[in-house]
Amino acid sequence: MNISERVRKLRAQSLAAEERISAERALLVTRFYKSDEARDLSAPVRRARAFEYILRNKKICINEGELIVGERGPAPKATPTYPEICLHSLKDLEILNSREKVSFRVDDEVRKIYEEEIIPFWKGKSNRDRIMDLMTPEWLNAYNAGVFTEFQEQRAPGHTVLGYKMFRTGFLDLKEEIRRSMESLDYYNDPNAYEKSEELKAMDIACDAIIMYAVRHAEELEKLAAVESNAARKAELLEMASICRKVPARAPETVHEMLQHYWFIHLGVITELNPWDSFNPGRLDQHLYRVYKKEKEAGTLTDDKLWDLLGCFWVKFNNHPSPPKMGVTASESNTYTDFCLINLGGVKPDGTDAVNEMSYILLDVIREMRILQPSSMIQISRKNPDSFVHKALDIIKTGFGQPSCFNTEAIIQELLRQGKSLIDARNGGASGCVETGAFGTESYWLSGYFNLVKILELTLNNGFDSRTNRQVGLETGYAKDYRTFDELMEAYKKQVRYFADIKIRGNNMIAKTFAIWLPAPFLSLLLEDCISNARDYNAGGARYNTTYIQGVGLGSMTDILTSIRYNIYDTRRYTWDQIMEATRNDFEDYWDIQHDLLYDTPKYGNDDDYADQHAVMVFDIFYDAVNGRPDSRGGVHRINMLPTTSHVYFGSVTGATPDGRKAFKPLSEGISPTQGADKNGPTAVINSASKIDQLRTGGTLLNQKFSPSFFEDEDSYACLTALIRSYFSLDGHHIQFNVVNAETLRDA
């Protein structure tokens, strides 16, 4: 693939565009809520009317030369805010404008709008205000101590993926489904019939709104065509206008129509609310291949046109930074990327190899575009050819960090264990970082990160947190009180269960706030069974409902427990008093102790059963405290093991630890070993990681670093493919390769 001049310019424009705050959406939603039209409406209808008002009044942006149209803001990287979810103060805006990393320019006009209209109306009324008022002192103490985080305090649910249906369905078809569901309501025997009718009414309004929004683009394109002097561009504008009058009202039938159809849906989801890990198209090669093959056979699609369409589509994702985050939410995941994860490969619904020509084409797009968004991954099944993996390695070896590699068989087994049907499991994949989901049928919420190491710190200090000077955990005793390792683990288990109880209670209350005050009628249209159930996405309307809690610091916890067991209980090299004194002083003047803890103690990641047994212990304790516990949407809680950047935040609130780690330094990430602890190569790492039962999770993250020189060997592809397949044969979920040299790491 060679990037055309058109795509080259659009890519350059996207890369050069400055991330800035746009007040457009915040102003429109505020004016709607203040209007007479918003009064005396049910919550779902009010939200649908607000959605319609925004789409009717927001600026239409058509960028020069593009073939896929639509921006969330008035220009590329003009990023909206969502005051009904989280209201930014003037101080917040100043921080966003001036902070060194992940900043957003805030101009005087935006500040004025916030000061005069946004803040006066929403102060004390945002869902974040509502959440913090509802939380118990125990929840607030744990949150402030850094025991866990809460995703929904600044974002909305919506961590889900478009399934097959919506690539073959138009919104006029959905309106017909809504009509049938409305007619089936039983006002005689169903006490919730009226509430269901309001939900369906809201969904119907949302259908009309997205169709109207597409027509507005068609009208703007026709205006541009009327004054366009270049005949070729004029024809493109008219073709695009025709497409916007067709999709998303009706089902797409060409590659161009399908990409534009999806993009309007994407904009609808991220305009309605600001879902964590923004909605994404999922298994894009599977969706596109059907129409691509039809067009190629008919001779209606050239390679050049296809490359242009896909390049323009890729740029669209990069034009949309993740909405700005503040405070703890910024610390846990402060990135511009919105984690829209394109899935390639895997298996078909009948279980056969799904790799096709489009899979390879899209890998070419990823290689040539090389931009931050969208993210990408390959699902690797036993049935996929090695040539598919090698094609991905062509990109990985360049140090781009994409695509990541996922185990199709593990994903399917994880989903089957959770009660999904075989077809829904095969049609699923991963979204966000590594999170497993049944695409098009599952509402899966990420509720926050869980600091496994902080809980041990509290366990060693009778539940008291010296950083916040509060009694945060249970009074289970001090380090010196634990006469045996088993006594320590029993106390740790009680603390984990205690904090899981607090977190899950909070999760269920928070979910109710979204169901009651912030339903998502547009998003509900896209998930199977919300229409037939006449129930909102945020209220459990989807076929499957799951709430995840993400464990962080497994590698660190493993090394800490290994060190405690080895140095205190087994070899008796040190006493608890010596270890606690050294950690209280951050190992200042205790270098000899720190040296032994760091360099003369078994470590996770080296295929050492003595160390690795503790990874299994920690995993099982966390799993037992969370898995299967009911959520408020009719689903259950489950666990993931991933950090985004929360391992850095969690480290910053955790003191020095008995593995030799200095105070406030980062914890380990995902299920990877502690930084620098693995000494026996990548095979030992995957053997250690595979000792935990990853199939009981909804996703685990394993990062591996390789030097560029590794790929100079002609056998490197075969070796790395064998490593991946070996790990996946051991039920590993995910592996990602960062290719960097030592000099780059030192500079970083």
Annotate each language-model stretch with its function.
Residues 201-212:
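Extended non-globular scaffold/tether segments
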Residues 2-202, 232, 236-239, 243, ...:
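Conserved catalytic cores of very large enzyme subunits
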Residues 211, 218, 222-225, 234, ...:
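Heptad-repeat amphipathic alpha-helical coiled-coil interaction surface used
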